[in-house]
């Protein structure tokens, strides 16, 4: 009876592992494609702004008002950005609105176009987190899809910056913010040694 029970447990683990690997592949492709579009448009916008900075910079305040209008008009909840991601990762939030993806991308593009300062890493993480969280909810992953959420965040960050290992640790750090055991960091330190 123990052998039968062990085999059932092994089959369940194998099925679960396959499901996670398939999900990672599908999400990696989708998140990578969105990141690529985001990054390419951002590079184009940066070049365009550099060539026309004197004309565009005076309109930065109006661009800011336009971004506020976009969030208020389409999805005010999405304005919380990374807070939504952290709350979802900690199980405090049921969903992240999909509208966050186009809004955060458009807001960053507009900001950069008119000479404002906005980071890319937060956008990449939010793209990955939002898409992966929606996927996990749709397919009813265990633990509210926390593993899938972390993988999606890492895919977003790693896809934009081409740093997969750093992305994994960054995503884990964001989700557990403040609750990661310091002893675990000692275990991971050896992974960074070859890069120095």
Model features per residue range: what roles?
Residues 1-196:
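Alpha-helical transmembrane segments and immediately membrane-proximal extracytoplasmic
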């Amino acid at each position: 009876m123990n052998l039968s029970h062990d085999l059932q447990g092994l089959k369940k683990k194998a099925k679960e592992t396959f499901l996670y690997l398939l999900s990672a592949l599908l999400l990696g492709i989708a998140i990578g494609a969105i990141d690529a579009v985001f990054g390419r448009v951002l590079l184009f916008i940066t070049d365009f702004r550099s060539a026309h900075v004197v004309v565009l910079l005076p309109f930065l305040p109006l661009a800011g008002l336009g971004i506020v209008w976009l969030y208020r008009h389409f999805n005010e909840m999405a304005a919380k950005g990374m807070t939504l991601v952290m709350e979802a990762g900690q199980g405090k939030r049921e969903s992240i609105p999909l509208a966050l993806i186009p809004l955060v991308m458009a807001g960053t593009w507009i900001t950069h176009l008119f000479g404002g300062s906005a980071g890319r890493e937060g956008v990449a993480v939010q793209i990955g987190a939002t898409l992966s969280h929606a996927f996990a909810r749709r397919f009813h992953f265990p633990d509210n899809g926390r593993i899938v959420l972390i993988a999606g965040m890492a895919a977003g960050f790693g896809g934009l910056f081409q740093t997969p290992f750093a992305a994994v640790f960054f995503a884990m750090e964001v989700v557990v913010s403040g609750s990661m055991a310091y002893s675990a960091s000692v275990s991971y330190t050896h992974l960074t040694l070859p890069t120095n």
